[in-house]
């Protein structure tokens, strides 16, 4: 049953906030592509393993790394249907541009209430941070809730020597790396330190940080900002102290109301996926 029928008020607020985000981006000259609605047949894909679907968070189901577009294999297998709404766009862009469009191996599904199990390589976009030719990939080996070691190996093997893929172990309460990590520019990031099970990755140890609490990261998605370019970011307006701290580092900070979206376990980074960046 559609969310807008179950709770019209909260659904309406969420739709309004998403449209406000789109308008903000468009007024800055950014071309925004939207997933198309799923057909009834697509909605029913693997329905025996769960019928829930949404298209709020395109970050997780695809990766764009250089000229590679990768449909990933997610832990919650019913989320695979989300790419049906994006595939026409990526096929068209792949034909227009010099890029490689591939899909990871599809995994054997497991039931929604079964214990997590590894049935193949699994990788989710929320775990992936591309920092030049270094790629950090979060992994929760305790809960096995998203990316696994097979997915990290697959990504390194696919990309080859041009990129260095580095696992980042996460603590048990954390779903994705971007719950508490956002690189605002080279050398500066928003972080929630408690999420790093083995401490900061060596790549980040000389960086400066704006720290957020675990509560802010899990409830407000405080580390989940939308980086518009080096030294410019859009964050949730419930985090004025984060905005002030970033401004002291010379960052241009924009804020937006997003409190009707974050209860679905995603923030501003989750809600978008940059395809092409053109920087001055």
Which residues does each PLM region occupy?
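The feature marks the mature, well-folded catalytic cores of soluble enzymes
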Residues: 1-280
């Amino acid at each position: 049953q559609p969310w807008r029928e179950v709770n019209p008020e909260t659904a309406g607020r969420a739709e309004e906030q998403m449209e406000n985000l789109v308008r903000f981006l468009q007024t800055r000259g950014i071309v925004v592509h939207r997933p198309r609605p799923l057909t009834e047949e697509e909605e029913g894909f693997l329905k025996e393993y769960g019928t829930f679907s949404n298209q709020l968070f395109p970050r997780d189901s695809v990766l764009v790394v250089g000229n590679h577009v990768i449909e990933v294999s997610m832990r919650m297998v019913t989320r695979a249907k989300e790419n049906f709404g994006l595939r026409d766009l990526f096929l068209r862009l792949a034909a227009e541009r010099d890029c490689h469009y591939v899909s990871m191996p599809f995994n054997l599904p497991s039931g929604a209430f079964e214990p997590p199990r590894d049935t193949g390589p699994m990788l989710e976009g929320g775990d992936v941070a591309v920092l030049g030719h270094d790629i950090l990939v979060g992994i929760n080996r305790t809960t096995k809730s998203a990316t696994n070691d097979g997915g990290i190996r697959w990504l390194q093997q696919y990309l080859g020597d041009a990129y260095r893929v580095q696992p980042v172990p996460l603590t048990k309460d954390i779903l994705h790396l971007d719950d508490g990590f956002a690189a605002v520019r080279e050398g500066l990031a928003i972080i929630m330190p408690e999420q790093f099970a083995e401490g900061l990755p060596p790549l980040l140890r000389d960086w400066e940080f704006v720290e957020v609490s675990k509560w802010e990261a899990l409830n407000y998605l405080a580390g989940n900002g939308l980086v518009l370019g080096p030294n410019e970011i859009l964050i949730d307006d419930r985090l004025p102290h984060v905005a002030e701290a970033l401004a002291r580092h010379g960052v241009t900070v924009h804020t937006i109301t997003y409190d009707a979206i974050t209860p679905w376990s995603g923030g501003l980074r989750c809600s978008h996926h940059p395809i092409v960046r053109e920087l001055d």
